[in-house]
């Protein structure tokens, strides 16, 4: 059983309103000099584990767990009354189940596979499966080692990509899709020669990022003299592929 509590606070202070008007595109809180945001997360996990080798039939260790997470985000908000500020609380919860299968003993083969699925709450449908392993073979008096690691993850964009309220940046993105990431990487090692060959590929679908949305400031002749700062969340609905390869001798 584990209990994890995270408390995070951010306070933004800016007294130079003239500079804010010049530098930022938006000043949602008017001349207010301070805006705050708070994040609280409480995660409770209960699990049961069967250790590798606890009897002659147990060739691998097995763990199963159940997790519940409560999250609260407090953001400064405005009202219909000019100058009035309130704290808007966004409450989220997520219930997930998971398991782990691992083999650490012996010399030939080792592996670890960890999976988790959100079955209810804000993150329902989110899942991740991660695995890594190594195979060790004797060949011509040398040890040849093959390492493999891979994962597939389908994850909800983080809260602050979905909702954010502050003095200069403000958005509500209720239509963001889950981010799908898959990766496969392998490494071949020859101990005697000190040779390593590594290759990997990763695919990202619905890549979500913070984009520069600044606008140009022009003089009376149309020349760009500067920019007013702004940012926005963007999501690329296509696929992004990353390939890597390395030979080390």
Model-predicted segments: where are they?
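N-terminal extension/subdomain marker
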Residues: 23-28
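Exposed, low-structure sequence patches enriched in small/polar residues
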Residues: 1-16, 31-249
């Amino acid at each position: 059983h584990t209990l994890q509590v995270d408390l995070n606070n951010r306070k933004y202070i800016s007294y130079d309103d003239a500079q804010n008007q010049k530098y930022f595109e938006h000043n949602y809180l008017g001349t207010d000099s301070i805006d705050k945001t708070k994040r609280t997360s409480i995660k409770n996990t209960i699990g049961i584990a069967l250790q590798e080798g606890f009897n002659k039939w147990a060739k691998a260790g097995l763990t199963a767990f159940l997790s519940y997470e409560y999250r609260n985000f407090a953001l400064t908000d405005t009202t219909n009354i000019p100058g009035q500020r309130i704290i808007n609380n966004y409450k989220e919860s997520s219930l997930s189940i998971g398991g782990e299968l691992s083999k650490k003993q012996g010399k030939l083969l080792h592996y670890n596979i960890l999976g988790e699925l959100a079955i209810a709450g804000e993150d329902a449908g989110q899942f991740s499966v991660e695995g890594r392993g190594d195979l060790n073979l004797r060949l011509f008096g040398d040890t040849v080692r093959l390492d493999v690691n891979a994962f597939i993850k389908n994850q909800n964009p983080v809260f602050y990509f979905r909702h954010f309220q502050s003095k200069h940046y403000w958005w509500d993105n209720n239509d963001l899709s889950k981010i799908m990431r898959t990766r496969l990487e392998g490494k071949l090692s020859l101990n005697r020669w000190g040779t390593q060959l590594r290759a990997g590929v990763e695919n990202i679908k619905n890549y979500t990022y913070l984009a520069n949305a600044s606008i140009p400031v022009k003089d009376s002749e149309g020349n760009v003299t500067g920019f007013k700062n702004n940012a926005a969340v963007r999501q690329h609905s296509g696929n992004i592929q990353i390939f890597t390869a390395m030979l080390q001798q």
